[in-house]
């Protein structure tokens, strides 16, 4: 059924059509003001499902830890050693992992040495040993690290007494019922590959990735991780955003108390150390990915594949964006300039 675009949608579609060029094959976006859809636009070559990349960190990992905190399973003083007593650096606080201030190495090419013939659960045991030995040099400043969120996955397993896939499935069923959010176990897509936005021509997998997670380490782990791995639609991403909005505004059905959501979404480290709440990005003074108009109370996150979600509680404005900007190669950074402009266009058009 054809739907009529609003004037905002018409204008935004024209702006995007003129802008995407060699930036990305397509963009899917949805904006909510006051919890109501005010903009729903698809431009270019778009598909139903997208690789969420690091949005996994908020849709899964941060949300699971926030809910665990809400039920009293850990405190702001809790350390890795409280849950993983054999870990080599037991005094790292969970809050340091959430704010990327632990000092753990930002990234390591685990995919180059992991035995991919092992079942994914055995690969996780191997990964734990690698994290034990990973470099860790705290500086007092935030250094974005995938390894910190990988470690949080083992904390979640200990908190729940279940493997990571079961932890994810429980969260999905309780917090996102009816969603199509999925991790691709053993890197097997749950839908026909044509339904997925293709990402990069991978030099070592020697094929165009479609329905396979773009992140090399997550792929080598069997598609299951806490730093990347989720696939979903714009309905799924916006659904998460509305769930977060309900938590922050204390609305009926929210999965955590408003006081917990307020704690996790406020600035957690000094500005000179970085722009982080507990698991969420905050708008930077210069070059914020949410553009120039979102308030300092806004929270969000981005994904390497060209995804993002930002919510401004002062404007009560939620913007969800999916793209496959890595299709032409990960070195194409043009989307990093387009994304804040999209947020500016939306705010200026309302």
What function would you assign to each model-found segment?
Residues 13-16, 51-76, 152-157, 237-240, ...:
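Active-site SXXK
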Residues 15-19, 266, 294-299, 306:
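Short, P/G- and charge-enriched loop/turn segments at secondary-structure junctions
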Residues 15-52, 73-76, 108, 113-116, ...:
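A short, well-structured edge-of-sheet supersecondary motif
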Residues 223-229, 296-310, 324-329:
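Glycine-rich phosphate/pyrophosphate-binding beta-alpha loops
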Residues 246, 260, 265-268, 285, ...:
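Short, gly/Ser/Thr-rich active-site loops of penicillin-recognizing serine hydrolases
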């Amino acid at each position: 059924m054809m739907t009529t675009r609003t004037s905002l949608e018409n204008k935004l579609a024209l702006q995007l059509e003129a802008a995407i060029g060699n930036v990305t094959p397509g963009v899917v976006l949805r904006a909510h003001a006051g919890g109501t859809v005010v903009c729903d636009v698809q431009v270019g070559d778009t598909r139903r499902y997208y690789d969420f990349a690091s949005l996994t960190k908020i849709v899964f990992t941060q949300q699971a830890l926030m809910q665990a905190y809400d039920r009293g399973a850990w405190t702001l003083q809790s350390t890795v050693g409280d849950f993983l007593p054999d870990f080599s650096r037991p005094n790292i606080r969970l809050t340091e992992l959430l704010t990327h201030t632990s000092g753990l190495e930002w990234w390591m090419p685990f995919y180059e040495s992991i035995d991919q013939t092992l079942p994914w659960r055995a690969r996780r045991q191997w990964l734990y040993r690698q994290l034990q030995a990973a470099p860790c040099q705290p500086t007092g400043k935030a250094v974005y690290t995938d390894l910190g969120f990988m470690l949080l996955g083992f904390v979640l397993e200990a908190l729940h007494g279940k493997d990571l896939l079961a932890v994810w499935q429980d969260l999905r069923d309780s917090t996102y019922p009816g969603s199509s959010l999925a991790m691709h176990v053993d890197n097997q897509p749950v839908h026909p590959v044509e339904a997925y936005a293709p990402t990069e021509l991978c030099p070592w997998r020697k094929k165009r990735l479609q329905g396979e997670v773009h992140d090399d380490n997550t792929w080598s782990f069997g598609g299951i991780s806490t730093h990347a791995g989720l696939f979903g639609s714009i309905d799924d991403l916006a659904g998460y955003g509305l769930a977060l909005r309900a938590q922050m505004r204390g609305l009926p059905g929210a999965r955590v108390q408003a006081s917990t959501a307020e704690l996790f979404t406020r600035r957690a480290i000094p500005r000179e150390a970085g722009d982080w709440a507990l698991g969420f990005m905050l708008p930077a003074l210069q070059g914020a990915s949410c553009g120039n108009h979102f308030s300092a109370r806004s929270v969000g996150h981005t994904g390497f594949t060209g995804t993002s979600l930002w919510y401004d509680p002062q404007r009560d404005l939620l913007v969800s964006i999916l793209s496959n900007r890595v299709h032409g190669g990960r070195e194409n950074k043009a989307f990093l300039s387009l994304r804040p402009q999209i947020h500016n266009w939306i705010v200026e058009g309302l």
